[in-house]
């Protein structure tokens, strides 16, 4: 038994009441770890011992041991539907030019609010995570998971009131179901690369500042110390780049992006950071779609392989597969372009527990009936992608996500 129910870390759970009256603690624990995740909020209100048990990080380890963990896909997405066609852009954004002396930026009203949506793959259910009433989720923030720590982080993005890049960090403790403020980044940034590269570290790089300048800078967040540290900057400024962990999850890859003077023309190369040497290596010929951002169009399981799936609207007969190495020759990426199986009003690709999934939006409300969308999983057979497992997305959750992460609970 990997978890003691009679003794909690810190010594404040030395003697607990019976978890289930009349049952030995070990047997009671075997029952409680089998309760589906969706009912665990209600379990917390039953008694203090249950609340303490569910708040302990080792509870998820017991669920994992019993094979009862559930996979959640977490999505940062707008809460409001797309702008109606009859309404002009000028009507949707209203800027208050009457600034007080201590305001460095005007406040912007009527911008869409963002939320954190969750799809439970085991139960095929959708719900939205409550956020503190006095706060708002930053627009276009990055969502990243630290699985072993049981935490979801929302990093950077735009301030909802000023639409300026922010340094803010919000941490959701899944065990206690509580939000807290994390230490802010050293530099404000949005549309940057972000990934967890070890059980306790999150790296960010690139993006742009409040003047739309592409950034070279990079930082690392230590979740245990709740602090940020600067690392060696990249050789190129990269706005709208994509980040992921490679090399068995030990290095940080920043894919494509564009410079300040070439906005909208996405680079074909990338850079890979090695924490062991605090240095970057370059990887060429990795992104062959200069008119398309890699954000929301790539997926892969880089913890155990080096394959990157690139999802496209058309079938690229001559460029279906290619491979490339970084200039240190320490890492090889195998890339494959996959044509999307259907079209829709929006497309977002990502990873769900190491498998590739694509969310395709349906009709907009202004086009008539709201159809929601569909999510499809791609399985790999003989190194070829095959679509399966169609999941209907309710209308309330079918807006285009900006970032995502998946976590076992």
Swiss-Prot record:
* Lineage: superkingdom: Eukaryota
Q: Which GO terms describe its cellular component?
A: cytosol
The yes or no answer to whether the keyword Transmembrane is present is no
**Ranges for domain F-box:** 17-63
Keywords, ordered alphabetically: Kelch repeat, Repeat
Q: Which GO terms describe its biological process?
A: negative regulation of cytokinin-activated signaling pathway; regulation of phenylpropanoid metabolic process
In residue terms, where are the Kelch repeats? 98-148, 151-199, 201-248, 251-300
What SUPFAM superfamilies does this protein's entry cite? F-box domain, Kelch motif
CDD domains xrefs: F-box_AtAFR-like (cd22152)
Instruction: Cite the InterPro entries for this sequence.
Output: F-box-like_dom_sf, F-box_dom, Kelch-typ_b-propeller, Kelch_1, KMD1-4
SMART domains registered for this protein in UniProt: FBOX, Kelch
Pfam families according to UniProt: F-box, Kelch_KLHDC2_KLHL20_DRC7
For whether the record's keyword set contains Metal-binding, the answer is no
Protein name per Swiss-Prot or TrEMBL: F-box/kelch-repeat protein At2g44130
User: Which species is listed as the source?
Assistant: Arabidopsis thaliana
